[in-house]
């Protein structure tokens, strides 16, 4: 994938607009997870070291084009300064004369954060005038928000049409990891795709089948495939209306030479609550009044054996209802084994999606995978094979501006 990075960029004295993703989880005004801030810090530090005047901007939450004080980026700018170890200014606007004055007063190496771009309706509408108003405060645009790349908004796509545009280091790392996962992977390559519904991951499964050698279907989604094969899944969550689709997917996988691996046993319970009585049974022997809530030990063993044969693993979705013990066991055991193989240099592991990242953190191995994407929606749309506007414009804008 051809896009320009910060390598060799002369940023000294230049106003560099950095589109970060500062949309961090907050509770009662306190940031509960600063991962996204930690991830964007290397790009900002590099630009500061190069003598740039760094102007950071981002969306936060969904204010729907209105000014909502509780959704201000002010507390996030403060936290970013603590992470970077230097003062970070804050401007209570993202366009207009106040911003122009603040940017005009910056010295080389200074950093400011602008107010939430979504306080303006022009952001989500990708209004060209709003994009121009953002762009006029920069000489260079650096997009370091892969997690917002699936949205064609003014701050992700519009600005890139008006300024020389580059991928930041986090964007570069995400794109390199994703390319290694599915575009040019070391084979054999496998994917763990979990979640509750086939209907929400149809495009994803269809795209992945074309690219992987082994597809592990896990979580409640597997129940639909099992039921479509005539297995009794008791009272388990499943989509009866998707049985024919599941059979078509299985047939397509066979045509493409992709092996689908389904659970062979399960941990079941009568209630979906913490620490309720459970039993383990083979698939096909699930009691009528029970629900499948986790993969069983034989399934874990089967997946571990298959992981031994792979060079690359893409992971999206847990193996069971991992949020509640003891239904986290299969997810934790497979995650820890994948991490062990990664540490031994035998497997490249690329994981993403909100539940997946939470599950890997729960298993204590989020930092031991080759790459864990914080992107959520953008990661899923990339897995679906969709064009991401924020990436596409980085490729085309350089050409438009004669900067290839």
Curated annotation (Swiss-Prot):
Pathway: Carbohydrate degradation; glycolysis; pyruvate from D-glyceraldehyde 3-phosphate: step 2/5. Keywords: ATP-binding, Cytoplasm, Glycolysis, Kinase, Nucleotide-binding, Transferase. The keyword Membrane does not apply. It is an enzyme of class 2 (transferase). GO terms for cellular component: cytosol. The keyword Transferase applies. Gene3D superfamilies: Phosphoglycerate kinase, N-terminal domain (3.40.50.1260). InterPro entries: Phosphoglycerate_kinase, Phosphoglycerate_kinase_CS, Phosphoglycerate_kinase_N, Phosphoglycerate_kinase_sf. One of its GO terms (molecular function) is ADP binding. Substrate binds at residues 21-23, 36, 59-62, 118, 151. It catalyses: (2R)-3-phosphoglycerate + ATP = (2R)-3-phospho-glyceroyl phosphate + ADP. PROSITE patterns: PGLYCERATE_KINASE. It is found in: Cytoplasm. It holds the Pfam family PGK. Its EC number is 2.7.2.3. One of its GO terms (biological process) is gluconeogenesis. PANTHER family: PHOSPHOGLYCERATE KINASE, PHOSPHOGLYCERATE KINASE 1, CHLOROPLASTIC-RELATED. Monomer. Belongs to the phosphoglycerate kinase family. This is Phosphoglycerate kinase. It comes from Gluconobacter oxydans (strain 621H) (Gluconobacter suboxydans). The lineage of its organism: Bacteria, Pseudomonadati, Pseudomonadota, Alphaproteobacteria, Acetobacterales.
């Amino acid at each position: 994938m051809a896009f320009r990075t910060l390598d060799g960029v002369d940023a000294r004295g230049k106003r560099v607009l950095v589109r970060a993703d500062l949309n961090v989880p907050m509770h009662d005004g306190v940031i509960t997870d600063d991962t996204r801030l930690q991830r964007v810090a290397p790009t900002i530090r590099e630009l500061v070291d190069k003598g740039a005047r760094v102007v950071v901007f981002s969306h936060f939450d969904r204010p729907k084009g209105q000014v909502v004080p509780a959704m201000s980026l002010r507390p996030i700018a403060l936290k970013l300064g603590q992470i970077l170890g230097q003062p970070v200014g804050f401007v209570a606007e993202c366009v207009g004369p106040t911003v122009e004055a603040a940017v005009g007063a910056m010295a080389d190496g200074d950093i400011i954060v602008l107010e939430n771009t979504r306080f303006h309706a022009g952001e989500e509408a990708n209004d060209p005038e709003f994009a121009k108003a953002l762009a006029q405060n920069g000489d260079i645009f650096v997009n370091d928000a892969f997690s917002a790349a699936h949205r064609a908004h003014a701050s992700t796509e519009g600005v890139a049409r008006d300024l020389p545009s580059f991928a930041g280091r986090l964007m570069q790392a995400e794109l390199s990891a994703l390319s290694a996962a599915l575009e040019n992977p070391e084979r054999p390559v496998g994917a763990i795709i979990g979640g509750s519904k086939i209907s929400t991951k149809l495009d994803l499964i269809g795209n992945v089948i074309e690219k992987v050698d082994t597809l592990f279907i896990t979580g409640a989604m597997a129940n639909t495939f099992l039921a479509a094969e005539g297995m009794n899944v008791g009272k388990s969550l499943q989509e009866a209306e998707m049985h024919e689709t599941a059979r078509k997917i299985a047939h397509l996988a066979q045509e493409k030479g992709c092996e689908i691996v389904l659970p062979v046993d399960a941990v079941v319970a009568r209630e979906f609550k913490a620490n309720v009585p459970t039993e383990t049974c083979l698939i096909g022997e699930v009691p009528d009044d029970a629900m499948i809530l986790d993969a069983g030990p034989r399934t874990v063993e089967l997946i571990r054996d298959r992981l031994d044969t792979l060079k690359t693993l893409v992971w999206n979705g847990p193996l069971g209802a991992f949020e509640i013990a003891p239904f986290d066991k299969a997810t934790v055991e497979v995650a820890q084994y994948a991490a062990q193989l990664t540490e031994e240099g035998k497997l490249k592991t690329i994981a993403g999606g909100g539940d997946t990242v939470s599950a890997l953190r729960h298993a204590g191995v989020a930092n031991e995978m080759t790459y864990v994407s914080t992107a959520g929606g953008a990661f899923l749309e990339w897995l679906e094979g969709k064009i991401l506007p924020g990436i596409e414009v980085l490729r085309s804008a350089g050409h438009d501006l004669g900067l290839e």
